[in-house]
């Protein structure tokens, strides 16, 4: 983005201002995010309890649907598992639904390895994919304690890798990893989660290199890859590649002109999506171990997508 090339005076560059043109609709969508209307469909009640496995030994009582519902309510209302168990019991009692409610221990134990599929709106056009990552805290005190008492408390983070649909702003792929895992190494896993054609894939300079281009080409050969090359990058010695064409255009017209012509500026939408995730869900993971944290992150992405589908702002830049 342009301000990144003015690091010495970045603080003097004003932030771009935008005006919302559909404020009544967006205002109504924000209010619908807090709607407490709850119901159980006949299909949900029928699928609430797990079917018999046909094997000897203990049988599961609750289906994956029941566990996912409980964990989703926990994230939406920002409460511990015991309170979530109480909420589920209260909802079943008020609606007079005859279902067994999983206790907090079951919700925690079954959360690890729970298969979570993305809940997305149907699309007919090829996907314009935006990739980026952000950090989520697992434990550790905040900056307030450090500043007030001069302490350096230990912190631990997980890295959340997101793939965003640039048109609908839905999260179409997500993966949670330890914080020492490189962004490029997770790209194949994100691409494998996407069904359908991908028209373009845009990511920041951390993904620059043959690994990212090969990962995209192996799965979607016709996809345009938009990644800013490093300032020290040189053309390849073999057949001209997409990266070579980016380098040639930057050398001829400049990096800012390349950003405008390639559509690289759309990558800021995935940064906005990460801010939306942290605003709705929070900046901290509740689960303690990595398998449960991965389930939590995928359910959280579905929650964010559900709220995104209620309505999004349409903005125009104020000149």
Model-derived segments and spans:
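Helix-centered, glycine/charged polyanion-binding patches within enzymatic domains
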Residues: 2-4, 11-15, 200, 205-278, ...
């Amino acid at each position: 983005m342009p301000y990144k090339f003015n690091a010495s005076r970045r603080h003097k560059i004003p932030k771009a201002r935008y005006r919302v043109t559909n404020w009544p609709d967006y205002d109504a969508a924000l209010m619908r995010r807090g709607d407490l209307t709850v119901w159980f469909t006949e299909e949900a009640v029928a699928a609430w309890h797990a079917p018999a496995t046909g094997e000897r030994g203990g049988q599961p009582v609750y289906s994956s649907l029941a566990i996912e519902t409980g964990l989703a309510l926990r994230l939406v209302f920002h409460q511990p598992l015991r309170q979530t168990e109480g909420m589920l019991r209260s909802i079943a009692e008020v609606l007079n639904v005859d279902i067994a409610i999983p206790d907090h221990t079951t919700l925690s134990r079954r959360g690890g390895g729970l298969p979570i599929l993305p809940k997305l709106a149907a699309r007919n056009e090829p996907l314009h994919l935006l990739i980026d990552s952000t950090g989520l805290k697992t434990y550790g005190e905040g900056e307030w304690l450090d500043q007030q008492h001069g302490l350096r408390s230990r912190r631990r983070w997980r890295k959340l890798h997101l793939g965003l649909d640039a048109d609908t702003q839905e999260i179409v792929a997500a993966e949670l990893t330890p914080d020492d895992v490189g962004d490029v190494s997770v790209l194949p896993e994100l691409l494998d989660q996407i069904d359908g054609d991908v028209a373009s894939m845009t990511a920041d300079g951390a993904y620059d290199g043959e690994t990212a281009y090969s990962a995209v080409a192996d799965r979607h050969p016709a996809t345009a890859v938009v990644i800013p090359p490093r300032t020290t990058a040189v053309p390849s010695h073999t057949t001209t590649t997409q990266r070579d064409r980016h380098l040639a255009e930057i050398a001829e017209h400049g990096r800012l002109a390349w950003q405008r012509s390639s559509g690289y500026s759309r990558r800021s939408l995935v940064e906005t999506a990460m801010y939306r995730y942290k605003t709705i869900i929070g900046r901290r993971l509740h689960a303690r171990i990595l398998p449960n944290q991965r389930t939590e992150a995928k359910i959280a992405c579905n929650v964010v997508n559900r709220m995104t589908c209620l309505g999004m702002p349409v903005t125009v830049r104020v000149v």
